[in-house]
Structure formats: C-alpha cells, structure tokens
Amino acid sequence: MNPKKSIQLWELQSLLKGATYKKLIEKKTYEAGKERADNYDFLFMSFISFIVSCRLFILVFTFIFKGFPSAIQVIAMIDAVVNALLILIVLAMLFIGSRKLTVEIRRGEVEDFQENLKAREDTFNSSPYQRY
C-alpha cells in the first residue's frame, strides 16, 4: 500500500469499525481545526496592526494640516478608504473562518492508528492495576 495516497471514506469505514473509526476522525478533525486556528491568529494580529497604523497615520496627518480646509477633506477621504478596507478585511476573515474543514487521512495513518490502539489495549489488559 502507498502510505502517501489519500484514503476514501468508504475504505476508511471498511478498515475501521465503530469506536475506532470515530476516534480517528475526531483526532484528525482536531488537528485540522488546530492548524486553521494557528493561521487565524496571524490574520487577526495583522488586522489589528493595520487598524492601529492607519488610525495613527490619520491622527498625525490631522495634527500637521489642521489649519487647511482642503486637508480636512483629504483626511475624511482617507478615513473613508480605511474604513472600506477594514470592512473588506473583516469579511475576508469571516469567510476564512467559515470554510468547510477538510480532513485528509492517509493509508499509513490508518494502519499506524490501528497498531497504536492495539498496543494500548494490550498494555491496559496486562496492567496489574486493571479494574474489575
């Protein structure tokens, strides 16, 4: 078997039965969700830094050109553009967060998971502290 090749859902269901199937799916879903959450933190921090830098630029620009009436119009226009960009970024972040989570399981992972579960069960069954 090729461990690099993805496995189809019906093959996975035929290889693993009942609780074992559910455990593997839960494990892989958790890993995929954790990976997405790590990327989401970076996007969130980039978003916050963009907001702060744009607002500071507008504040400095306001103090420098306070006496010129045309400068107020420029500041208002810059503020409107920044607000539009922020709305687009928020929509992009919501889209990224709402995408369907893709879980990919490889053949080698299924075999390793079965072996690990079997080893754990054997260890538990041979334990002197086993409950009756």
From Swiss-Prot:
This is Putative uncharacterized membrane protein C622.03c. It comes from the Eukaryota. GO terms for cellular component: cytoplasm; membrane. It is found in: Cytoplasm; Membrane. The chain crosses the membrane at residues 44-64, 75-95. Its main location: cytoplasm. It is a multi-pass membrane protein. Keywords: Cytoplasm, Membrane, Transmembrane, Transmembrane helix.
